A protein has these predicted regions:
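Mature catalytic core of soluble alpha/beta enzymes
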Residues: 2-325
Length: 325
């Protein structure tokens, strides 16, 4: 959809959101019938994004969309694994031979990933790339990997196997063949950056990046519904109110997948076992930082209620909902 294609987003947001994990309803819209919502959607970072503003002035939505796209592009140039010229691709090629000096934004993601690794007990680990390669999530293979292949890949996985120099903002791999995948953290940072830049344009709005949501300003909360993980084309009976300024992310095993021998494998790989996790539920996280919500939903999907309880206790404000299959 191009920039001139606008719509009252009551329908478009619901449709896009249903595809990506959410249905957003303004909890008190019925009491404020004059409130107007406009939205524009576009493809970026391998998914669909949508920018929604409430009661925007003339030209504000277009300017806001351009602002959001510019922030997303910053992260794409850094974290795109499919672009050999991206900063992350350069890091993965050279960090075993010599230390790699990171840009400020890449370093920000790596430090958050370090915290995530320790907080989750290794459930979230950006060094999972060798396993993602092995299981065919970048380039499909003919059959599922065997146990020996998984063990070999696991030797290259583990955040504790990289060396960070926080004074020089550098990183070095200690094992050949290691690689970083920022897929579980980059979209969150992109949303945080876009929200910061959008703050002066609009009082109230929603940014949606492939189902990762950031709610902008205002005083009203947003009613969020969550997909049924057993029937992803329908919503579950779980809803919650997300406050202004908060972020929401859901992880489940019903999105990206590969099929080997008639068996379906979801894209969320446990970096400890080396196998894709068949979750009992989906995990939805609501907290202030979109980057934190991004990785935490993945970690909670893998580790379940115990980690969810820890996060709610130690990351307040943080709200987590598990929807069982």
């Amino acid at each position: 959809m191009d920039m001139d294609t606008r719509t009252r987003c009551g329908i478009i947001i619901a449709c896009i959101a249903l595809l990506t994990g959410y249905c957003i309803v303004d909890g008190i819209k019925a009491q404020v019938p004059s409130e107007r919502r406009e939205s524009v959607s576009f493809r970026t970072m391998g998914t669909v994004a949508a920018v929604t503003f409430y009661d925007p002035g003339d030209g504000v939505l277009q300017k806001g969309c351009e602002t959001v796209k510019a922030e997303f592009e910053k992260i794409i140039r850094i974290a795109n694994l499919y672009d050999s010229g991206s900063e992350l691709a350069q890091l993965n090629r050279t960090a075993y031979q010599k230390e790699f000096f990171c840009s400020e934004l890449l370093w920000q993601m790596i430090l958050e990933a370090e915290y995530a690794f320790h907080f989750s007990g290794g459930a979230f680990d950006i060094t999972v790339k060798p396993l993602m390669d092995l299981w065919g999530f970048y380039r499909k293979r003919g059959e599922a990997p065997n146990e020996n292949e998984i063990k070999e890949a696991l030797n290259k996985v583990g955040f504790h196997k990289i060396v960070l120099d926080k004074k020089k903002r550098s990183i070095r791999f200690t094992v050949p063949g290691m690689g970083i995948d920022l897929g579980g953290i980059a979209k969150g940072l992109a949303l945080d950056l876009a929200a910061q830049k959008s703050a002066g344009l609009i009082e109230r709005g929603v940014l949606d990046l492939g189902g990762n949501l950031k709610f902008l300003g205002g005083k009203k909360s947003y009613l969020v519904g969550i997909k049924n993980p057993s029937a992803p084309d329908r919503l579950s009976d779980k809803t919650f109110h997300a406050p202004p300024g908060s972020s929401v992310s859901t992880s489940g095993d019903y999105e990206r997948k590969v099929i080997y021998g008639g068996k379906v494998y979801g894209h969320i790989i446990d970096p400890v076992s080396g196998y894709p996790e068949r979750g009992k539920y989906s995990a939805t996280v609501c907290c202030r930082s979109a980057m934190r919500a991004d990785w935490l939903s993945t970690a909670v999907f893998l580790r379940g209620k115990k980690l969810a309880e820890k996060a709610e206790k130690e990351m307040n404000p943080c709200h987590i909902i598990l929807v069982e299959k």
